[in-house]
Structures are given as structure tokens and as C-alpha cells.
């Protein structure tokens, strides 16, 4: 418009009308809440700003019991049935980055392996720890090794009260909050919407019992990036689980309800892809913590976050931008 003759009113009017055409609503009715709706409050609005060039930001985490410390607060799942080359490449990447794995079988030596235990996958004594579905918890955990890290996978809000009570009474180390039922069936991650409300609901349930620090919370479902990880850690998770994002980095291609792997990728290329993704996500999560004035990723808290949609405020228990609180009574 700046280059148009200012006296040419018809042309200016036509150009303006084109620019004023209504666009599609980015938040239509029924839109599912997303982690993209969450924003971090910059440190200069809430506290003293750290010097990102001089002050390091630690991101390592211990899941509990005597498990080795994870260099990155990440776990990976969903690779039990992929081609052998993909498994080996993933194992090498996990060794390089210090990331753990959740699955029925070990895919590499010298990694934190949390074994998925069910009717067809008995506990392996070489596993770092075990996770069982809530439906099998009472049966499987009565015979577990009491000195091993043990967790319960829960995916439905109506199960959480009983699961939390059982976990506290049985000295369970962790609750795996499976927001898409993807720990047991990776294909669900392509067909279901993530239930981010599992995390704030569990934190609230533990807080009511004054047991918030007694159980490690690990969230799985819809995690794509380091920013997603930082937001979930701020909401109360100690670690997050990647599935589809890592599969794509390893050469996977989404095919409706499954992921197929390109056959022209070498093992080195797959390893490099997964390693780059995990390291980039670690740096991104650290960056978000630094922006909020924290020198440790796990010092992030819900007060560092705001959301920009009412549906996300309701689901995630985070205040809407411009407000101070949110009513959690409607959750569940």
C-alpha cells in the first residue's frame, strides 16, 4: 500500500478489503487443549534475571530408589517391535545422551531400562526397574523385588485415587501418567488426544494427602519438544517420555495408525538423528528454565506458567494470562 498513489482511493479501498477478510479462528469450538497454549513468564517480570553466560542450568534427575541418575530428564518408549537396526541405533543414542528406556526388552547395555511387566513379559532381573499397568499392580507387585525401582502406569482419572492410595501404602517409587495409553501400545499415540490433566490432578491428589514428595511422577503422551518437557516438569513431572518424536528422528514415517521406517537410512544416520533430537530438546528445556530465572530445570513450578485459552486453563490447572488462579474442583 505504501507504493500506491495516495490519491487512488479505489485501489486503496480494494487492498484494504482484501486484508480485512476474516480468517479461520485458530481456537475453534471443541479445540483440544495443547501445550502450545502454555507460555512461560519471563524472569524480568517476576524475579532477578540470571546470567545465562555464567550460571549453568542443571537438568539431570534421579527417578528414585537406587536408579542411576539420568543425564537428561527423558525416557523413550515404543520401540519393542521396530526393526533391529532401529533398536540398535536407538540404544546407541540413549547410551550417548544418558537417556532411559521403557519397554518389554532391553535394547542396549549400560542404559537405564525400566521394564514393562505384564502377563506375557515377566520381570527380568537385569532391568533397572519395573513398571506395571494399574490393572495388574496388585498381582504383579506382591512378588516384586522390594529393592528395585517400581512404578505403576495409570491412564484414567477415575483410577487415580485408588492408584495413589496403593502406591503410598506399597512404597511404590513412581507413577507413570500415560496420557495416551502409549506405553503399552505405541499406536495409540497416533490416534488419541493427550490427557494433560492427569498431571495436575495427580499433584493435587498427592498434595491433599501431604505426600507430594513421596512419589516420582513421569508423564507420557504428546511430548514433542524440550519446551513441552519444561512445561510438564513445571507442572510437577520429574521426567517425560518421548515416543513418536524419537521415531521420526530415527527415520520413521507416519502411516495413518502406524509408523514405518525408511529402509535407506544407515544405523549411523538413525543414531545421529535421535541423538540430535534428545540433545536439542535438553538444551531447549534448559533455555526455558533460564528464561524464568532458574538455574535448575526441576525448580520450575506452575507459578512460572500461564495459559492463553480457557480450555487449557481448565484441563491443566494453570492460570489464564492476566489472572492469578484457576479452579481445580472441576477436574476429574
What annotation goes with each model-predicted range?
Residues 71, 77-166:
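Active-site-facing alpha/beta catalytic cores
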Residues 101-103, 241, 299:
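A structural signal for short, well-ordered beta-strand segments and their strand-loop junctions
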